[in-house]
Amino acid sequence: MSQEAGHSFFDAMKDKGIIAGTVVLSKHGHDAGRIYVVVAEHESFLSLSDGDKRTLDTPKRKRRKHVCPLGQMEKATEWLTSLKELPVPQQSSELRKAIRNFMDGHRGPVTS
């Protein structure tokens, strides 16, 4: 988990809230328990992708209050930008790898 200038993930959450690159757990709905990456943020909604049922092309739109933040991916902004430049099948594959890697405790996208 990245910590800039003595700030923890929780300090960043207090300052900015859930932002793009945050890994979240769905708390409510038919997808409860599913892990997503926030790919875009709106006032009260988030756009979520998991690389499986929800790709970058068709993100899930979910209310902020219906997700629980798990952590922030390192260099998330740069990673999401480079991810969007890949072909769709590769985007999904890289997104799934990054979520799996994050959940295994590495906190960032897998580099080849």
Explain the meaning of each model-derived region.
Residues 29-32:
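Short, charged beta-turn/beta-strand-edge "cap" motif at the junction between a beta-strand
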